[in-house]
């Protein structure tokens, strides 16, 4: 798993997170995922799979996260915005799951994304309807 380490001013320290970002006007969800992955990590994905989505805090926000898993990655340079400081950190899948469970990864979207993906990978495929 390629995580990013980003200093979050509101928290006052760096957090480990999945690469993420905002959707540009007229941009598809998949295109946004590919763009953010490339900008933050430098990786270009040859394959992208939608895992699903979830509301972050529906009682107060309309923010919805859409989760994708990228594959067939090709390394390249990051394309950070001015002032952005993002370090990449590679960890094994099982280690990322453990980091969510032990509190090392504290970012809600990352915890939800990693654990949701892990749960779906471990379940047998459901029969077609």
Where are these regions (language model features)?
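A contiguous pocket-lining binding segment that forms or flanks enzyme active sites
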Residues: 26-71, 78
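Residues at the C-termini of beta-strands that transition into short coil/loop
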Residues: 5, 71, 92-94
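Nudix hydrolase/Nudix homology domain
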Residues: 10, 14, 25, 50, ...
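Conserved Nudix-box catalytic region and its N-terminal flanking loop in Nudix hydrolases
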Residues: 1-35, 39, 73, 77-78, ...
């Amino acid at each position: 798993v390629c995580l990013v380490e980003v200093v979050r001013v509101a928290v006052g320290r760096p957090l480990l997170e999945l690469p993420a970002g905002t959707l540009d006007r007229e941009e598809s969800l998949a295109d946004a995922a590919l763009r953010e992955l490339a900008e933050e990590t430098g990786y270009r994905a040859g394959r992208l799979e939608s895992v699903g989505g979830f509301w972050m805090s529906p009682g107060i926000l309309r923010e919805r996260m859409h989760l994708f898993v990228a594959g067939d990655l090709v390394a390249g340079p990051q394309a950070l915005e001015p002032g952005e400081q993002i370090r990449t950190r590679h960890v094994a899948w099982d280690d990322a799951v453990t980091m969510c469970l032990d509190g090392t990864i504290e970012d809600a979207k990352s915890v939800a994304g990693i654990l949701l993906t892990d749960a779906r990978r471990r379940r047998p495929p459901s029969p077609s309807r």
